[in-house]
């Protein structure tokens, strides 16, 4: 970075295995905080801007019951959320020009993610239990990427530093999400049943309500955010096309 006239860095790299992070805290801190600090300091020397992807996990398990705003204090309950918060704090402490995009329930056509897993399970399992007491909003990675690149291409990041929330519009539980995945895919032979989170013990307490307030990003950049079911239909259509 320092040897080249780089004006902008988009950092999508992160340690994202929430449960494994509990046993690998040092490496999670290295990727989610120390590496972010290094990027921030490097691009600052070029008088450039750092765009960084963060997460709803910085808020922890507080029972907000209203969409989380950018200025709400984070109280992470696990290593993953804490190290991501440390990354945000490292950016702020560096003084670098930056935009931080917090997102949630991210999925796409690629890699391992909830949508692809549920597509497989609902097409092969006769019954499936999915938690209904965790609420949020799915985010199609393509929508997030399009938003970020629109901001970059129009150079609107120059005068609009800060933290922004982005997810698709709407609210659902993981159970609702799974039901919609199966419906769109035509996987109607699987009996999808709602259950409590305590039926799936985990090392980390997941946020019970992680809906993100997107007022700031919509008003600042004038963007329109797609509804989560519309984006899910697009993603599943693309997944099926890739498999054909």
Task: List PLM regions with ranges.
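Conserved catalytic-core motifs of eukaryotic protein kinase domains, centered on the activation segment
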Residues: 19-26, 61-68, 111-112
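SDR active-site strand-loop-helix element
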Residues: 9-13, 50-56, 101-103
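NAD(P)H-binding glycine-rich loop region in Rossmannoid oxidoreductase-like domains
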Residues: 1-31, 44
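A short helix->loop->beta-strand "cap" motif at the edges of active sites that frequently abuts
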Residues: 45-49
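Amphipathic terminal alpha-helices
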Residues: 228-244
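NAD(P)-dependent short-chain dehydrogenase/reductase
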Residues: 89-136, 141-145, 149-150
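Catalytic helix-loop patch of NAD(P)-dependent Rossmann-fold dehydrogenases
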Residues: 30, 35-38, 58-101, 105-106
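Mid/C-terminal beta-alpha module of Rossmann-like enzyme folds, strongest
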Residues: 147, 154-203, 243-244
